[in-house]
Amino acid sequence: MTARHFLLDTDLTSSEQAALLDLADQLKATRRDRKPARRPLEGRSVALIFEKPSTRTRLSFDVAVAELGGHPIVIDSGSSQLGRGETIEDTAAVLSRYVDAIVIRTFAQDRVDRMAAAATVPVINALSDHTHPCQALADLQTIREIRGRLAGVTLAYLGDGNNVAHSLLLAGALAGLRVHVASPPGYEPIEQVVRHANEIGAVTGGEALVTHDALEAAAGADVLYTDVWASMGQDTESDSRALVFQPYRLDEKVVEAASPDAIVMHCLPAHREMEISAAVLDGPRSVVFDQAENRLHAQKALLSFLLDETTAGVGSR
């Protein structure tokens, strides 16, 4: 049987995505109420490969695997042969003999794809330079539990058209969201991603729009979202990016342009008074810590979806 991977947001269908979010809600409620939970990963091991530093992704996956009954094995590239030149293909082949799934957080999407091509167990993209699909699942769960729905909701993303923006566009399209991205010229999301999102949206009712005007994107939005201006590996560009992205800061003026009950999201870590004002990040509309918590529940649902035979067919193609 061929392993099912989660490399891009679009590796799920709309119905699979909805079923996975339903499962995430159920798992969250079970944990909150301290009820006995199923342990579908009992006796299984999951390798967690981190080639980039991580707090939320590492901890949430570690806890997720453990709470599902499995054994998480964290592998830092600096302390393994992977960081000393062993090929990603050889690593995938060996790990497939030891573990039941591989989670990888790395720099290039190509490394995720190559890992999956050589592995015989499920591979999960925990972040690449192209997408951040696990983050988007948690974001959708957060929006749905607060707004009560996803279809027809307008999300305004301000800032760099990066991996988070790409995943919001693609996952949002599957869910029927209207995703409006405001980025400076030259920092927009990849055109192919925007086009693909609109192709999906033509079926689901979603929409992908890119503008250079932050207030235009935010006008009437139900969700306001931002991310850091300089991602890991772009440290030398921090000062120049700060100047370019200043008009895209999520501040009180942007909040006023949005819907009166708009929520504020940030995938964290945040730099107060840079991409977002402290008043907005710490204000009553902010749901950033609910969003961070939902990484755990969404990833438990994803692991169950890929590895638990009792849920594998839910919402299937």
UniProtKB/Swiss-Prot annotation:
Chain positions recorded as L-ornithine binding sites: N163, D227, S231, M232
One Pfam family here: OTCace_N
Localization per Swiss-Prot or TrEMBL: Cytoplasm
The protein's Enzyme Commission number: 2.1.3.3
Top-level taxon: Bacteria
Keyword vocabulary terms for this entry: Amino-acid biosynthesis, Arginine biosynthesis, Cytoplasm, Transferase
Class of enzymatic activity (EC top level): transferase
SUPFAM superfamilies tied to this protein: Aspartate/ornithine carbamoyltransferase (SSF53671)
Keyword set includes Cytoplasm: yes
Disulphide connectivity of cysteines: none
Transmembrane residue ranges: none
InterPro entries: Asp/Orn_carbamoyltranf_P-bd, Asp/Orn_carbamoylTrfase, Asp/Orn_carbamoylTrfase_sf, Asp_carbamoyltransf_Asp/Orn-bd, Orn/put_carbamltrans, OTCase_ArgI
GO BP field: arginine biosynthetic process via ornithine; citrulline biosynthetic process; L-arginine biosynthetic process
GO CC term, one of those recorded: cytoplasm
Function: Reversibly catalyzes the transfer of the carbamoyl group from carbamoyl phosphate (CP) to the N(epsilon) atom of ornithine (ORN) to produce L-citrulline.
Record protein name field: Ornithine carbamoyltransferase
Biological classification of the source: Bacteria, Bacillati, Actinomycetota, Actinomycetes, Frankiales
